[in-house]
């Protein structure tokens, strides 16, 4: 019985697939092939005579009219119109182009060639050997009330919610971690050095991601231990897992957010002052955290610009005193900037300062 049902589903699926292919082919034939046939039947070059370099006389049949045209490299001139003479061959061609049977045969020859047949046959054979669970239906939504009063959803629904939440990972990574501060500081460093394309964006983003995971490792580990592991062992519900997982991120963001920004967005949201930091809602904390991160990144960038700005001023003054006003100062100052950055071990100094700025 199960085998009969399985083959019935496979047969129905194959029928739908073949029907779809035939329908799409008919659409292609209807809007493309017929137009080509009609255009070819309306116009035909009967004969042509070459008179010289890029000079020809051409006789063209357009439906029942025969035209004599003079053609050069620059223009086409209508010379004469011959009497309307329709040859039997031309009549047969027009009759064929308007005949339904001819169109059908031409369509079959065009679309159902050997390559098309082989492709459809291979696809049908592949679908015949698909496992039966490929045709399984969508499971029902099942939920029940837990002992603590919460609602527990079935595993397929939980999986669907989890896969859907993966689309928000880039937003979480950009707005709720240390990534924004790091990547802005690296971009400002590149501008201060005077090398707008080196290191390239891919390297800066990759280095920022690595440092983000390094800095956020304790928070991610706590989320894994307190939220994911109990949920994977069915000890807590998905609602409890989300609440537990948000607490470490909430604490991290609160510690990096300025009090002024929190008060500003709380005022915009018409919320009074909070007695405890844990009571701050995410809709207030998230914009406050982003604003604080931007301000901190610009402050770090300002301190990075100062030594390189001094080098630019010194080089410009020297060039002006030597009368070399046509020489770009950035060309001369770039080697000195790179030498200074390498001598002070700039990468290690900058990465150390960025890491310590999150755990001061």
UniProtKB/Swiss-Prot annotation:
InterPro entries: Flagellar_biosynth_FliO, FliP, T3SS_IM_P
Transmembrane residue ranges: 10-28, 115-137, 152-174, 203-220, 297-319, 332-351
Entry keyword Cell division: no
Protein keywords: Bacterial flagellum, Bacterial flagellum biogenesis, Bacterial flagellum protein export, Cell membrane, Membrane, Protein transport, Transmembrane, Transmembrane helix, Transport
Pfam family, one: FliP
Subcellular location: Cell membrane; Bacterial flagellum basal body
GO CC entries: bacterial-type flagellum basal body; plasma membrane
Chief localization: membrane
Keyword Cell membrane: yes
Membrane association type: Multi-pass membrane protein
Record GO biological process: bacterial-type flagellum organization; protein secretion
Function recorded in the entry: Plays a role in the flagellum-specific transport system.
PANTHER family in alphabetical order: FLAGELLAR BIOSYNTHETIC PROTEIN FLIP
Family to which this protein belongs: Belongs to the FliP/MopC/SpaP family.
Name under which the protein is recorded: Flagellar biosynthetic protein FliP
Organism listed in the record: Buchnera aphidicola subsp. Baizongia pistaciae (strain Bp)
Lineage: Bacteria, Pseudomonadati, Pseudomonadota, Gammaproteobacteria, Enterobacterales
Gene name of the record: fliP
